[in-house]
Curated annotation (Swiss-Prot):
Organism, scientific name: Drosophila melanogaster
GO process annotations (BP): mitotic sister chromatid cohesion
Biased composition (Polar residues): 99-113, 329-343, 395-405, 432-447
Function: Acetyltransferase required for the establishment of sister chromatid cohesion and couple the processes of cohesion and DNA replication to ensure that only sister chromatids become paired together. In contrast to the structural cohesins, the deposition and establishment factors are required only during S phase.
Protein name (record): N-acetyltransferase eco
Observed phenotype of the null mutant: Flies display disrupt centromeric sister chromatid cohesion very early in division. This failure of sister chromatid cohesion does not require separase and is correlated with a failure of the cohesin component Scc1 to accumulate in centromeric regions.
PROSITE patterns noted in UniProt: GNAT
Keyword terms, alphabetized: Acyltransferase, Cell cycle, Metal-binding, Nucleus, Phosphoprotein, Transferase, Zinc, Zinc-finger
Family, similarity comment: Belongs to the acetyltransferase family. ECO subfamily.
PANTHER family tied to this protein: N-ACETYLTRANSFERASE ECO
SUPFAM superfamilies: Acyl-CoA N-acyltransferases (Nat) (SSF55729)
Ranges annotated as CCHH-type zinc finger: 852-876
CDD domains from the UniProt entry: NAT_SF
Molecular function terms from GO: acetyltransferase activity; protein-lysine-acetyltransferase activity; zinc ion binding
Amino acid sequence: METPTGSGRPSRMATPRLSERKRQLFGSPRSRLRQINDDEDDADVDSLGVLPLKTHVAANRKGRSLFAAVPGKSSSSANSSPETNKENKKTRGGVMTATAEQLPQLFTATMRLNSNSSSNSRNSSPRQTRVQRKRADSSMSSPTSSSEGTPSSRARNSIRRSPRTFSAQKDPDAFSSPESFQTRLSKVAAMLMKGQDSRSMLEKSKKKHNHSLKTTAQVHTTKPKKTSPAEESQSDDEKPSSSKNSRKNTEVRETRSSQIISPKTRNRRRPFTSADINCKTLKAAAHLHENMRSYDEEKTAAVKLENSRSRSKSPVEVFKSNDDAVKRNTGNTNNKTAKSSEVATAKRPESPGSSMKIDVEVPESDEEASNHKPQKRQHPETSTPVAPSADADSGSPQSKMRKVTLSSSIPTMAFYSHSGEAVTKSRRRPSISKNSLKQPTKISPTSRPLLGINKGVHHKIRKRHGFANRLPATDMDNILNSLSNERLKNLITTKREERAKVEEVHQILRNAKDPIKMAKPLSVIEADDANNNNNLPATAWQETSADFSDLSDVEDIDPIIEVEPIIPIIRHEPVQKSPTAEPADLSKRKFFKSGRRSSTCMEVRITDNIRASVSQGKIELVQTIRRKPRQVRVKSATIFSAEQATVDAILKNLDDTVVDEIVEANPVVQATPIDAEETTMETESLPDIIEYAPEANDVEIDPFAEFRQRLPYQTDDPNVVEQQQILLEFLISNNICTEKNFEIFIANPDDYKDEANQIVDNLYMVVNSEEAAQLAQMETVENTAVAIAPKQDAPAVEEVQPKLFPIFTQRLQPVVQKSLRRRPDTSMRLLTAAGGSNQYQIDAGQKAFGARQCQQCGLVYTVHEPEEELLHREYHNSIHVLRFKGWIDEDIVSVYPEWASDGRIIRINERAPTARLDRLRDLIGVVDKELGYSSYIVPKIFVAFIAVRKQQIVGFCLVQPLSQAHRFIQVDGTDYFSEESYPASCGVSRIWVSPLQRRSGIASKLLRVVQCHTVLGQEIARECIAFSTPTDDGRALARQFTGLDNFLTYDQ
C-alpha cells in the first residue's frame, strides 16, 4: 500500500495476517509457488495491505497511481490503517477535482464504487447458492475485513450476481439521484466536446482486448502459473486502462480462477463487470450508444457460439464448425435487435473495456479467428466447483489448497492414443479443417496387417524393400567359362542342374493351387509354359516366397540367403539281371510317382516269412517257391497194411517227418528261406542251377519214363494202381529205381518181402549213421553229380552212400537250426513246469485255469483250487513282512552294491533284542508257507542271515550248529539217506529267495556268507555244510555249491 504523496505522514507498513505469515514461513512447496510473481504484479499485493517478504520499491509505483498529482487521493482498503480509514470517510462524500485527461478514469472509478455499495444486500438475495452465502458470511466475519467490504471483494461479488437481479442490485445512488447523473453526463459531454473521440477510445480498448486474448492463448500453451491469494483478491479500482501486458496476464489468471461455474448455475449466473455499467450509462449519448451496441452484438453472437461449443459433448464437431459458425454469426450481428442483444449479453457479456476475461476467448473477426490458436476443450464438471471468493483472502483452509481450474487441468482423454493426437494437433495448428480430421491415423509399416495380439503396438523398424532387385545378377556362365579346372567345372555344372531340378519342383508346388493335381512327373509338366521354371526370369525364384507378416525381419531383408530344403537325389546301381520295365501310362499315374524308370529291385523283410519287393514304383509280396504236391500221404499208411507187406514194412520203419521230406517229387527247384542280405547273391547263382538241373534230369528221364509207362502193372484196380504209383515215386526220389527194385516193390511184391524190408532198413540206417558226414558233404559236392543214380544192389548202395546222397539227404532228416523264437522268461518256465506234461484239469471253457504266478508276491499257484488259492492269499497278505527299512545297529557281514545302493546281508542270532526276534519269527512263518513246512520250528541256537535289497527282504538263510550228518542218495527218483554218519560243521535249516529275485545269485552269496561268518575266525569247508530235507531247487543248489551228488543232509 502506498501513502498518497504530500500527506505529511511517514510511510507505514501493514502487519501481515497470521495465516499469511504461517504460509510464508512454513508453507509447502505448493503454497510457495503461489508467492512467485513477476515484478509487475507487486502492486496487486500492496492493494491488499499484505507486504511479501521482499524489498518493496515505492519509487517504481508512481505510474500505477491513478491520481498521483492529487493530494486528496486515497485508496479504500479493508486492511488499511485507522488513519487511512478516517481519511477515506472524509473524502468519500466530497468532490474530487481532476484534470480533463483524468476524467474518463475518474468516471469509471466512481461508477465502480457506487455500483458495488450494495454488496450487503446481495448477500441476502434468495437466488444465491449455498456456497456463495457461505463465502459471503466468511468474508463478512473475516477479522481483517471491514463491514463494508473491500472494493475487490465487491467487484468479485458483483460478478456472481444473477442476471435477473441485475437492475435491482445496482447502486441506488447511481440511478436514483438525478443530480449525480446529470453531473456525470455533463462531464462526459465536456470530454467529448474537447475532442476526445469515444470511437478512438473504443478502438484503443479493442486493441487492448485483442492483446489480452493473445496473451490468454499464450497462457494456455505454456505451463500455467500458480497465483497467490493476494493476486486473486485484487480490487478493480486499481486496474487502470494503461496497465502493462504482464498486468493483463494477471487479469486473465484471475478471470480463469474466479469464473468456474457449475453446469447447474451457469445460465443463472452472469459475469457483471464495470464495463457493463459503462454500456448502460452511455446510452444517453446516441452515437456512442450505437457504437457500443454494434460492438456488443458482435461479441454476444460470438459468446453464444462459444457457449454452445462448451456444452457440446463432441469436441470434434466444435472444431469442424468453428470457421463457418463464426462467419455466420459475424454476418448476422448487424441484423439482430437490441432486445436479443441484451438477452444474450445477460447470459455471458463481454465489453472491450473490461479487463475480466471469460473462459472461452472469442475472436474479433475472421482474421483473428484464424490467427490465434484454439483453446483446450472445456469439460463440464460433475462436482460443485470451488470458486475463489473473499474467504481466500481471510486465510481460510481452502486458500491453502491449490486452485484447480479447467485451464490448468489435463483432460482424461489425453491419456489415450486416439485422443492424445487430437489434442496435440489442436495445440500446434492454428486451425483444423474437416479434411485433416477425417484422415485416418497412419500405421507403419503399411504392408503389415494389424494382428490382434499386437494391436496398437508399433515400432520404428523399417523393412528394406527392393533389396533383392538392387543386387546385380550373377552370371554363372562367365564364371564357368573362366574356370580352368575341368573337374571343378563339371562339379559346379552338375550341382546347378540338380539345384535347378529341385527348384523346379519347389516352384511347381508353390504355384499350384491344388498340389494333388500337380503331382505329376516332371516330363509331363515340363511342356506347360505356365509352370515351366525355365521360362521364368533369373531373379524370379528369389521373390516367389509369400510375404508373411509374422516372419522375422531378417528373412525379409535378405531373401537371397534363404536356403530351401534340398531334396536328396538317390542313385541306385542297377543289377545285372532286372525285369523289363513296361511303358507307364502317364494318365494313370498314382499320387507322387516319378516318371523315372528305375531298374532297382529292392527287397524288404516284413517278418520272418513275409518279404516284399519294390520294383517299377510298385510294392509286391515275394512269393515263396511252391513245392510240388506231395504224392506220398500219411493216409496211405493204413491202406497198404493189409494188402502189401513191403509197403507196410516201409511205412512202419519211417517216421512222419521222414516221410514228409522223402516224398518230394522235384526237390532241386525248391529254394530254402534266406536272409535279405543274401538275396542278391542267391539270385545271381540260381540261374546256374536252373540251367544245369534240366540237363541232368534229361539223362535220367528216359529210364524213369520207361518205368512210368509200365503203370498200371497187371491190374485194373484203382487202389492197386495208386499203390504202384506211390512206390514208383518212392524209388525214383531215392534214386534206387532199377529193374530189380521195380520187380521187388511193384511187379512181384509178395515174393520179395524180405528183400524189400532189407532195402528199407539199410536205407534208414545209412541215413542215421552218416548224418554228420552228409551234412558236411552238402556244401562240397558238385551239383552235376546229383542226378547220377547207380544201378547196383543193396550191398553196393551201402558202400557208396556218402557219394549217392549229397543233397537229397538234406530233406530226409530235419537239419538242426537255431530257433528264431526268443527264450521264454522265468515266469513262463515256471508256468510250464507247474502245468507239467500231463493234464490234470479239464478245459471246459473257463476264463482261467492252471498254474499262475502272482506279479506282486511271485508265488506260483493253481487257479480254482481252494487249497492253492488259500495258500496264495495267506502268503500275499503276509508280504508286508518282507518290507525292511533297516535297524540302527545292524550286523552287516557283506555289502553288494550291484544289487542296489542298500544291497547287504545282515546277521542276527538268538541274543538279539526281542523285537528283532519277533520280526524273525514272522519272516520264518512266511518262508515256511512257501517251502511247505508244517510247523514253524526255530532252533534254540541259530544264526540267521537276511539279504536286503531296496528296503525289501529278498533272501533268508537259517543256520544251526551240527556235528554229524548223512549222505544224500537218490535211487529212481526217490530220496534216501545213508545209514553211515559223517562229520559236519553246520546245518542249513532253511534257505529261501524271493520268487521275483531268483536266478540272480542271491542263494550262492548267502551260502558263501554262511561259510565265512558262521563260526568266528574259521571258514567252513563246503563239503562240511549239511542241508535239511531239500526241495528240488534246494537239491540243485546243494549239488552246485558243494560239487557233490551225495552231499550231506540231515533231518531236523
